[in-house]
A protein has these predicted regions:
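Extended beta-strand/beta-hairpin segments
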Residues: 1-49, 60-135
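Alpha-helical metal-binding/catalytic segments enriched in His/Glu/Asp
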Residues: 54-55
């Protein structure tokens, strides 16, 4: 299987991940509370962001398949860390959709596919995923 991402440790608790097909680069820094500079996303920030991105992406796929428009959205993400062991204990997502005319049936479809997205299903069951949808 061909590689799709190249990750380099570049010193000072920083990494660079390159998406090989597009050459897009994501930089991570260790957070200040974990001996880093905190000048970029931390790896755990990316986990929280990936959860939200996955949810909104599968919602878009659902809308396309069901032939309705998914309104643009803005989400706010809160990541809660625990210390023993150091891990993400909770991710809170608030996903706000622009003015829309979605039916209640389509809203329920969108919520269901979001909660069942691949990232949500891949995370440890001990991690609390609190999602607020504002349509």
């Amino acid at each position: 299987m061909p590689h799709s991402i190249e990750n380099k440790y570049v010193g000072e608790l920083r990494t660079e991940s390159t998406h090989l097909k597009s050459s897009n680069v994501i930089i991570t820094d260790a957070p200040k509370d974990n001996n880093g500079k905190g000048n970029a996303f931390s790896p755990t920030d990316l986990v929280a962001s990936a959860l939200c991105s996955c949810m909104t992406t599968v919602m878009g796929i659902c809308a396309n398949k069901n032939q309705f428009d998914l309104p643009n959205s803005t989400a706010y993400i809160t990541k809660v860390m625990s210390s023993h062991p150091r891990r993400i204990s909770k991710i809170i997502l608030e996903i706000n959709f622009d003015n829309n005319n979605l039916s209640e049936q389509n809203i329920e479809k969108l919520k269901a596919v979001a909660i069942g997205c691949p990232v949500a299903q891949s995370l440890n069951s001990d991690l609390i995923q609190e999602v607020r949808f504002n349509f």
